[in-house]
Amino acid sequence: ATSEAAEAAEPVEITVTTTFAGEDGNAQNYKDAVAAWENETGNTVSDMSATSDETLKTRIVTDFETGSESDVLFFFNGADANDFVSAGKVVSIDDIRKTYPEYADNMNDDLISASPADNVKYAVPVNGYWEAMFVNTEVLDAAGVEMPTADTTWDEFLDDCQKIKDAGYTPIAAALGNIPHYWWEYCIFNQQTPENHLNIPASADDETGTQWCNGLADIKDLYEKGYFPENTLSATDDETFASFTDGKAAFLLDGSWKVGGIVSNCQSDPEDASTLDTAKLDNFDVTYFPGKGNRKTTDLVGGLSMGYYITKKAWDDPAKQAAAVSFVEYMTSDEMVAKFAQHTATALKDSPKVDESQFNSLQVKAMSMMSGVTSLTGAVQDLFNGDCRVSTFDGMPKIVTGKTDIAEAVQEGIDTYNAAQ
């Protein structure tokens, strides 16, 4: 979706603020993209980008209050933007599309976050994070199990785990005594839908509390069936990760940030990308966490917390409007999003056509998975954090071994949460 409008007008200068600066991994990609857009359109960018920290957040809010905001802004789409959204200082995607129908038309609107201030979508996202299930396909092949897909159900997943166990392998690489976070999150999500996953229970026996208890009961069930490593209660996450990469375990539930760890594990020198054993890496894949109940398998935990805004100031300036639109379209094209996001979350409708020599096979598989995602929902544990989680996170070994009653553990966490409010 690239606008022709900008090339027709007289060259203009637009001011842009992003967080692609300092140590940000995309700082150079951003500089290169700005230079290419300037070259293509004849326009120029006055770049005000800075490292994402509290200083930048304060500066942006102050800029809006004093009328010195940028024309285009790459910023958080959550509560940090509430002040300038509520003040009407940015233009919604729908309003921009009334004049430029192709604006962000390469994006799946279901994956674009609405502002919490008014439930309207303003920011066009680039990259974010996802949590999903990595697979060692060598183990699946040895056990005669098919690769799980977008249609795999929870019961089918349990059957697969049993076959893997019967073949002498560990079905699930997880250290429940160290990092139970991902299983806690998804097993609770499996009792819910994207619409209610971020609810915090008022008590262990209300609707949400019951869902949490049932989710933890599923983890206990997996433990009792012997689908976790024998040492899952005492092992470290690093140890169970090694069992996965060494071909002893089939499934690993983790985040998009784990792709790099799997890739470097397939290098003879973890620091040197040129030593990658591509045949070894080809044994790894990534897919959706099997769904249960009303959660579709393709509903992922993840998020796109930032995006490009066009300010009202730029929109109302006849000289700058088309250039601002052109800039955002350029920075959010399929090609550019693939470069910035790589294997992380995006809102692209289609898996981008990428130069596969620039990406490894696991990154390409992750991009393909993303194109089938039906929703991204944040992790409820990020809202229910700190000491609230001790009874069910640190307490997971006692929960799965039946030494602690699940409802009591959930209630203890809720009591801690309520006391902190």
Can you say where each PLM-predicted feature lies in the sequence?
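Conserved C-terminal helix/tail region of periplasmic/extracytoplasmic solute-binding proteins
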Residues: 141, 337-338, 346-357, 368-421
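A structural signal for short loop-to-beta-strand junctions that line the ligand-binding cleft
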Residues: 63, 70-71, 102-140, 170-171, ...
